[in-house]
A protein has these predicted regions:
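Alpha/beta-hydrolase superfamily serine-hydrolase fold, recognizing
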Residues: 1-146
């Protein structure tokens, strides 16, 4: 949602946020990235069932899932503010962050991508329970404080 909204704001010549923070973003509702297969059995939240991806139908409705405001991976990244992507290495959504970060860099954006090893979807919500979660929030604070 963060990327889709930023693209929309830019396209409407509206003010953009100064920075974008994305935690395990779902940027490709077509599920075409390699991690959808590679992490199929590793992802404790989405893995081992395609039914877990059912939300894409509710979100996209009858719209083409490749529309940039639905799947920002297929959009234009030019002119977007600095962005931080955080993602776990076990996520089916890993390639969504990796590919979006790559595309943003190619468009000249200031991009930070951090892949947290052996972490799952939105591990950041574990707050003080996991060292990786604490590190992720510290990274967000440092990124926003720049």
């Amino acid at each position: 949602l963060v990327l889709a909204l930023a693209m929309y704001l830019r396209d409407q010549s509206m003010p953009l946020p100064k920075k974008l923070v994305m935690m395990s973003p779902w940027t490709d509702l077509t599920a075409s990235g390699p991690s959808y297969q590679e992490n199929y059995e590793n992802d404790p939240l989405f893995g081992n069932t395609r039914e877990s991806m059912i939300y894409n139908g509710e979100y996209a409705g009858k719209q083409d899932p490749k529309l940039p405001y639905i799947s920002p991976l297929f959009g234009d990244f030019h002119g977007l503010p600095p962005m931080l992507f955080q993602v776990g290495s076990l996520e089916m959504l890993l390639s969504d962050s990796v590919l979006a970060a790559q595309k943003a860099k190619e468009a000249g954006c200031d991009v930070t991508l951090t892949v947290y090893q052996d972490m799952f979807h939105v591990f950041q919500l574990s707050m003080d329970k996991l060292a990786e979660s604490r590190a992720a929030w510290d990274e967000v604070a440092a990124f926003l404080g720049k």
